[in-house]
A protein has these predicted regions:
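Conserved helix-turn-beta segment immediately C-terminal to the redox Cys motif
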Residues: 60-80
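Bacterial signal peptide processing site
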Residues: 18-22
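Local sequence-structure signature of Cys/Sec-based thiol-disulfide redox active-site neighborhoods
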Residues: 38-60, 99
Length: 173
């Protein structure tokens, strides 16, 4: 029973946001010179997230710094959005990015790997996922702390495989 309760609480936390104070929408909505310069060659993503998730904002900042443009949506039912996109609960994290082509990027996937994926999408791919919220992944930086993690290739048949193993912070950039 305790194990079930812990699982439910973990999933609830991941799907409803990180519990941090609301932050500004995104620098994508600002008039800063850097945002204007990056927009001309930017790859657009729609990012679904809780309005109170600070680590989601940090991931968006990471993506924008690497030439992506984020349009932010705050749906009231994140689990429904994820299910509609074909993301199984075991791959869940706190936010979901969707490319113009319809590929999904679940969680704290490094921009480098999103770009690599979009440049050469594997056959039958749904997208990439970093389940949960690994410490040290883009948007989850905590000083010098870093936990190695896998980036998963999600397939349209519901299966997954390892797309990349991230063993060091440097491999993310």
């Amino acid at each position: 029973m305790l194990k079930l309760l812990a699982s439910v609480l973990t999933l609830t936390f991941a799907l409803t946001g990180c519990g941090e104070s609301p932050q500004p929408e995104s620098s994508a909505t600002s008039d800063s010179a850097s945002a204007v310069n990056n927009t001309a060659n930017a790859t657009a993503l729609t990012v679904y997230k809780s309005p109170t998730c600070g680590c989601c904002e940090d991931w968006i900042t990471h993506m924008e710094g690497e030439g992506f443009e984020a349009a932010i949506e705050h749906p009231s039912r994140m689990a429904t959005i994820k299910a509609e996109l074909g993301i199984a609960p075991e791959y869940g994290s706190c936010h979901t990015g969707v490319s113009e082509e319809g590929y999904v990027f679940e969680g704290h996937v490094p921009a480098k790997l999103v770009r690599q994926f979009l440049d050469n999408p594997p056959e039958n791919a749904l997208g990439l996922a970093v389940p949960r919220m690994p410490v040290g992944s883009p948007g989850m930086e905590m000083g010098e702390r870093f936990d190695p993690y896998d980036v998963l290739l999600l397939k349209t048949d519901g299966s997954s495989e390892i797309y990349a193993r991230i063993e060091t912070p440097e491999q993310q950039y």
